[in-house]
Swiss-Prot record:
Gene: SNX13
GO function terms (MF aspect): phosphatidylinositol binding; phosphatidylinositol-3-phosphate binding
Family: Belongs to the sorting nexin family.
Comment block on domains: The PX domain mediates interaction with membranes enriched in phosphatidylinositol 3-phosphate.
Summary of the function given for this chain in its UniProt record: May be involved in several stages of intracellular trafficking. May play a role in endosome homeostasis. Acts as a GAP for Galphas.
Domain RGS: 373-496
Protein name: Sorting nexin-13
Signal peptide extent: none
Organism: Homo sapiens (Human)
Domain PX: 570-691
Lineage per the UniProt record: Eukaryota, Metazoa, Chordata, Craniata, Vertebrata
């Protein structure tokens, strides 16, 4: 039974399943499962939603039930505030000048928009806070403008800034000297220089050192916060200052949003280098200065940057597919770049190996040095300084000073006697005062150098001294009264082995050559300005035209001479007919073909002659020496040491030389100087041109002639002064007395006695600020004051002898008085007034606005420049600075001194920490000038009192003062 029942169950079950599958299909199982899952999931979702709603209702009931009831006054007040917002009236007047207020208001608006509003509107829509900030800033600006109007800015711009800059430069110079004097063989790093700089600063300032502010960003921010808070106390109304939230907010905006970014930019060396290049952007690039910078550079990064750029340019030029005329230009450029690359590689290798070469010491080991004649030394300031130092060492300074004093006496006597004769010719009343003063001056020279009481005494023949004494006693003094003895003294200095011959073997002679720029190697082999042997008249040297000697031709009006430089060299003989460039034993130079026409009554002749630029230069020196009036009329085109084979340059020089020839051959010129024809005919004759001066002589003339011409100009200016005879005699008497007195003091104190070696004390001028060393008589003379400060500190003239420094001072005084007189002070004061005028202030504000917000939009951050670009900018900046230095300055203080001074100033700006120090010094001086009634000096001393260098200095003072106190 059971078996049958189970079979029936399984049978009926199977039948049901089969019928179910046949009826609903084979996927009914999946559908059924899906329906069940949806049912269960829907039930869970409904349960969760119902529970969430009930929970929120319960929590809301709990909150309202436990918290106290809300006061109805608060919502009411909020509604009233929103309904009637308090209006803040802002006066848009700031400085009283509309041209300043308008751009200044835009700066305030842009600042609030880009630095405050963008985050404030995410917190609140209330405008009152923004208006309060604007009102606070305007109040501060109004107080600042009012204070600025009451201040005389002329002393700050003409005195304080110059003193601060000069002192900063002095500290840097002394820090460099300390680094150099260290015994460590390892070269000092930039960190050592910065530390040494602040050590020197505290020694000089005594009461303040800014090392923490300049080297620690955290301390710098704290310093700026304290400073801004003090300024807000002075500029804001008491009510606004007592609002701490507002005060701290404005303080942070000023300190971190305005002052700190501005100081970061002003102290960035790369920014300063770009600004220097922009300031002198109009000056032409000097290739000689560029090569000097490369050869003198001790920064491997600079050399690598220049070398990589040269390699890049070489690759570009070699990839060009050119033919014809352009190929010569490209070859010249490639050769120039290869030379630059070679110089950079050799300099890098030398720096990496540590085998630095001192050019002066290296030249001293060479036997072949340029010979500078004694007469050239005596007329050049730079050369005379070194010869004077040598004569002091050998004890022959009395001979040199006697020669110089006699030269001064001769010039003075000639001028005064000419004035005396001119007044006699005019029939004016004369006195014997002039001759009496000349006699007194001559007797003073005799007593100081030649008498038996003279110490030291100039050793010359006794009969010459006796003859001079007799002349002084019985005859009127003449300018030539000392000529015989002066000639003997000159021969003694020239031939005595103790003096000039030994001087040529001394290290001072090599240093003199360096200052005269006569140790310099030629930087480029090919040169149009070559100083070698002149071309022999034709390209092949085989043309010999049978012409009469032009030197025998007179300057009669019947003979007419015309000459011009043709476009190309004579085609039958010139292999470079287009370029006019020749090559002789590997040396490339340009050759100019001159077509000459000579006409007279019966015949006409024409020929070609060939001259180099060096021939023109030698010819120009010849005729200007013989005919001084031509020096102001004829102007020869200047030299170009590097890359002077360029086609455009050669064409320009050809035009300039043509203009020079036409002016020279003008009939009026020939009539004015009849003897000039001989020199012109000799130059234009078709034969090898014989130079009257060699390489060295022309270089000597280059630095001697400017000084000689300047002395002539000063002499002419003195002669043309419209003084009366009494005034002239009085001035002469004063000058002669001062000359004799000062010269005697200098000889006794500075030259005849060796100064004792004593340690530096607090009274040492080098350990004081620059302003503490100015003469009282030049304190009111603004231009002379500025020039003396800059000359002293930039070129370190205090290390030179006092004769040169006094000579430079007198030269500057004569230059200023002859050029402007007393009006230059007035012009400087007017310029300061113009700088602080409303128009210029408005222009500065507009430039600031346009720089930070071009077209009203905040400028994007400037991307950081690549290191190689910054290094090339450094090289370009140094090259520009060296190129703008006039040759006249080199002739006064020396080429080597000029180079060192310029590079010292440039190197000073390459340290961010030192630039920061200078910016803060200027800022402190500005605030001390703006608020003279407040004790800003004491405030800054307190703010910088945590300086580590200051603490070390105080400890050092205590240790040095302790023994002296114990003795007491």
């Amino acid at each position: 039974m059971l078996t049958e029942a189970s079979l029936s169950i399984w049978g009926w079950g199977s039948l049901g399943i089969v019928l179910f599958l046949i009826t609903f299909g084979p996927f009914v199982i999946f559908y059924l499962t899906f329906y069940i899952l949806c049912f269960v999931g829907g039930g869970l979702v409904v349960t969760l939603l119902f529970g969430k709603t009930n929970s929120e209702k319960y929590l809301e009931q709990c909150e309202h039930s436990f918290l106290p009831p809300t006061s109805p006054g608060v919502p009411k007040c909020l509604e009233e505030m929103k309904r009637e917002a308090r209006t803040i009236k802002i006066d848009r007047r700031l400085t009283g000048a509309n041209i300043i207020d308008e751009p200044l208001q835009q700066v305030i608006q842009f600042s609030l928009r880009d630095y405050v509003q963008y985050w404030y509107y995410t917190l609140s829509d209330d405008e009152s806070f923004l208006l309060e900030i604007r009102q606070t800033l305007q109040n501060a600006l109004i107080q600042f403008a009012t204070r600025s109007k009451e201040i005389d800015w002329q002393p700050y711009f003409t005195t304080r800034i110059v003193d601060d800059f000069g002192t900063h430069l002095r500290v840097f110079r002394k820090a460099q000297q300390k680094i150099t004097e260290k015994d460590d063989q390892v070269k000092g790093t930039a960190e050592d220089l910065v530390d040494t700089f602040f050590e020197v600063e505290v020694e000089m300032e005594k009461e303040v050192c800014r090392d923490l502010v300049c080297t620690s960003p955290k301390d710098e921010e704290g310093f700026l916060r304290d400073l801004c808070e003090v300024l807000l106390y002075l500029l804001l109304p008491p009510g606004d200052f007592q609002n701490k939230i507002m005060r701290y907010f404005v303080r942070e905006i000023l300190a971190r949003g305005i002052l700190l970014p501005l100081i970061n930019q002003l102290s960035d060396p790369d920014y300063i280098n770009q600004y220097v290049i922009w300031m002198i952007r109009d000056s032409n690039c000097n290739y000689e200065a560029f090569m000097n910078i490369i050869k003198l550079s001790d920064n491997i990064g600079e050399l690598e940057a220049v070398r990589d750029k040269a390699a890049e340019e070489l690759q570009y030029l070699r990839s060009l597919d050119t033919a014809g005329d352009d190929i010569n230009t490209i070859k010249n450029q490639i050769n120039s770049l290869l030379f630059v690359k070679k110089v950079c590689d050799s300099r890098i290798q030398r720096l990496q190996s540590g085998k630095e070469i001192n050019t002066v010491k290296l030249a001293a080991n060479f036997g072949k040095l340029c010979t500078v004649p004694l007469d050239s030394i005596l007329v050049d300031n730079v050369a005379l300084q070194f010869f004077m130092d040598y004569m002091q060492q050998t004890g022959g300074q009395a001979h040199l000073f006697f020669w110089m004093t006699v030269e001064g006496y001769r010039v003075t006597a000639q001028q005064q006697l000419e004035v005396l004769l001119s007044r006699q010719r005019d029939g004016k009343h004369q006195t014997n005062q002039t001759k009496g003063l000349l006699r007194a001056a001559a007797v003073g020279i005799y007593e100081q150098y030649l008498s038996e009481k003279a110490s030291p005494r100039v050793t010359v023949d006794d009969y010459l001294v006796a003859k001079l004494a007799d002349t002084l006693n019985h005859e009127d003094p003449t300018p030539e009264i000392f000529d015989d003895i002066q000639r003997k003294v000159y021969e003694l200095m020239l031939r005595d082995e103790r003096f000039y011959p030994s001087f040529r073997q001394n290290a001072l002679y090599v240093r003199m050559l360096a200052e005269l720029d006569m140790l310099k190697d030629p930087s480029f082999r090919g040169s149009d300005d070559g100083d070698g042997e002149s071309f022999n008249g034709s390209p092949t040297g085989s043309i010999n035209l049978s012409l009469d000697d032009l030197s025998n031709v007179s300057s009669d009006d019947s003979v007419q001479l015309h000459a011009y430089i043709s476009d190309t060299v004579y085609a039958d003989y010139d292999p470079y007919a287009v370029a006019g460039v020749c090559n002789d034993h590997g040396k490339t130079y340009a050759l100019y073909a001159i077509t000459v026409h000579r006409r007279n009554l019966n015949s006409e002749e024409m020929w070609k002659t060939y001259r180099r630029y060096s021939d023109f230069h030698d010819f120009h020196m010849r005729i200007t020496e013989q005919f001084e009036s031509l020096s102001s009329i004829l102007k020869l085109p200047g030299k170009k040491t590097f890359n002077n084979m360029d086609r455009d340059f050669l064409e320009k020089r050809k035009k300039d030389l043509n203009a020079y020839l036409q002016l020279l051959l003008a009939p009026e010129m020939m009539k004015a100087s009849p003897a000039l024809a001989h020199y012109v005919y000799d130059f234009l004759e078709n034969k090898a041109y014989s130079k009257g001066k060699g390489d060295f002589a022309r270089k000597m003339d280059t630095f001697v002639n400017p000084l000689r011409n300047s002395m002539r100009n000063v002499s002419n200016a003195v002669k043309s002064l419209p003084d009366s005879l009494a005034e002239g005699m009085t001035k002469m008497s004063d000058n002669m007395g001062k000359m004799s007195e000062r010269l005697g003091q200098d000889i006794k104190q500075s030259f005849f006695k060796v100064p004792p070696l004593i340690p530096k004390t607090d009274s040492d001028p080098e350990h004081r600020r620059v302003s503490a060393q100015l003469d009282d008589n030049v304190d009111d003379n603004i231009p002379l004051r500025v020039m003396l400060l800059l000359m002293d500190e930039v070129f370190d003239l205090k290390e030179r002898n006092q004769w040169l420094r006094r000579n430079i001072k007198n030269l500057l005084q004569q230059l200023i008085r002859a050029t402007y007189g007393d009006t230059i002070n007035r012009k400087i004061v007017d310029h300061v007034d113009w700088m602080t005028s409303p128009e210029q202030v408005a222009d500065s504000v507009k430039r600031f606005r346009d720089a930070f917000w071009p077209n009203g939009i905040l400028a994007e951050a400037v991307p950081c420049r690549d290191k190689s670009i910054r290094m090339r900018t450094r090289v370009a900046g140094k090259t520009k600075l060296l190129a703008i230095m006039p040759d006249e300055l080199k002739h006064i203080i020396g080429a080597e001194t000029t180079r060192k001074g310029i590079l010292r100033v440039f190197e000073m700006f390459q340290h961010n920490q030192l630039n920061r120090r200078m910016v803060y010094v200027f800022l402190e001086g500005f605030l001390e000038t703006l608020f003279p009634q407040y004790k800003f000096r004491e405030l800054f001393n307190k703010l910088h009192s945590r300086s580590k260098q200051m603490q070390k200095y105080k400890q050092k003072l205590q240790t040095t003062q302790a023994p002296s106190l114990q003795k007491r």
